């Protein structure tokens, strides 16, 4: 019998620090990394590159099923590779975001991408970053982590990120946007944002990223008997 590669799922709301934690875990353990939040954007960009009709579910399904995408952590930064090309910046454009929203509306496209995400589960293991990784995509994962933080702290972090990039931002507006997104994510009909019953819940509100990584790594090593 072939052993199934282990998975560490990291779910949680936007701005809790999932991306940073997952990149650190992938680099330390030498495992594969899946950024599920970027998958639809990568599909949208592939559709644009290959001139696939974004309104056609029939045309998008095979593209989704065979999507050539990799996530490569490099010294604290994540490179998103589509067909061997780094598209980390390109997938963040408004045009790609709008196209991604249209693609996500098709049930068969979602199903194809679900199977594509599960295909990332290869040896020696996978770190899966998302919102329903531990509850839906990899519900049998041996290690599940739910990373949370207060809406105020997540808004503060986001404000600092944007200010570092030279943007002028309003804290109250950011906080309102985060609270609205939280409400949508936690109350949606399909796969609402919630910790898996067997997940370790980490509240990073008052923790440094080093503390979060240390706690998550020690927990994972204990469960997986990694020294």
Swiss-Prot record:
<keyword id="KW-0067">ATP-binding</keyword>
<dbReference type="GO" id="GO:0005524">
    <property type="term" value="F:ATP binding"/>
</dbReference>
<dbReference type="GO" id="GO:0036431">
    <property type="term" value="F:dCMP kinase activity"/>
</dbReference>
<dbReference type="InterPro" id="IPR003136">
    <property type="entry name" value="Cytidylate_kin"/>
</dbReference>
<dbReference type="GO" id="GO:0006220">
    <property type="term" value="P:pyrimidine nucleotide metabolic process"/>
</dbReference>
<protein>
    <recommendedName>
        <fullName>Cytidylate kinase</fullName>
        <ecNumber>2.7.4.25</ecNumber>
    </recommendedName>
</protein>
<keyword id="KW-0547">Nucleotide-binding</keyword>
<keyword id="KW-0418">Kinase</keyword>
<dbReference type="Pfam" id="PF02224">
    <property type="entry name" value="Cytidylate_kin"/>
</dbReference>
<dbReference type="InterPro" id="IPR011994">
    <property type="entry name" value="Cytidylate_kinase_dom"/>
</dbReference>
<dbReference type="GO" id="GO:0015949">
    <property type="term" value="P:nucleobase-containing small molecule interconversion"/>
</dbReference>
<dbReference type="InterPro" id="IPR027417">
    <property type="entry name" value="P-loop_NTPase"/>
</dbReference>
<dbReference type="GO" id="GO:0005829">
    <property type="term" value="C:cytosol"/>
</dbReference>
<keyword id="KW-0963">Cytoplasm</keyword>
<feature type="binding site">
    <location>
        <begin position="12"/>
        <end position="20"/>
    </location>
    <ligand>
        <name>ATP</name>
    </ligand>
</feature>
<dbReference type="GO" id="GO:0036430">
    <property type="term" value="F:CMP kinase activity"/>
</dbReference>
<keyword id="KW-0808">Transferase</keyword>
<comment type="similarity">
    <text>Belongs to the cytidylate kinase family. Type 1 subfamily.</text>
</comment>
């Amino acid at each position: 019998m072939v052993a199934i590669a282990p998975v560490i799922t990291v779910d949680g709301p936007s701005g809790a620090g999932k991306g940073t934690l997952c990149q650190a875990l992938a680099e330390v353990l030498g495992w594969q990394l899946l950024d599920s939040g970027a998958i639809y954007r990568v599909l949208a960009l592939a559709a644009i590159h290959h001139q696939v009709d974004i309104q056609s579910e029939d045309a998008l399904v095979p593209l989704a099923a065979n999507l050539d995408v990799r996530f490569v952590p490099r010294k604290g930064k994540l490179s998103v590779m589509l067909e061997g090309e780094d598209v980390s910046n390109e997938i963040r454009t408004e045009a790609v975001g709008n196209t991604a929203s249209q693609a996500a509306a098709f049930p068969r496209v979602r199903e194809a991408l679900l199977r594509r995400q599960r295909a990332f589960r290869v040896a020696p293991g996978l770190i899966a970053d998302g919102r329903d990784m531990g509850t839906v995509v990899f519900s049998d994962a041996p290690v599940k982590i739910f990373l949370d933080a207060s809406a105020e702290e997540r808004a503060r972090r986001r404000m600092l990120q944007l200010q570092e990039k030279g943007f002028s931002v309003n804290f109250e507006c950011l906080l309102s946007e985060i609270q609205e997104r939280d409400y949508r994510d936690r109350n949606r009909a399909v796969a609402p944002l919630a910790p898996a019953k067997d997940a370790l819940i980490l509240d990073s509100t008052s923790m440094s990223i080093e503390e979060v990584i240390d706690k998550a790594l020690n927990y994972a090593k204990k469960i997986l008997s990694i020294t």
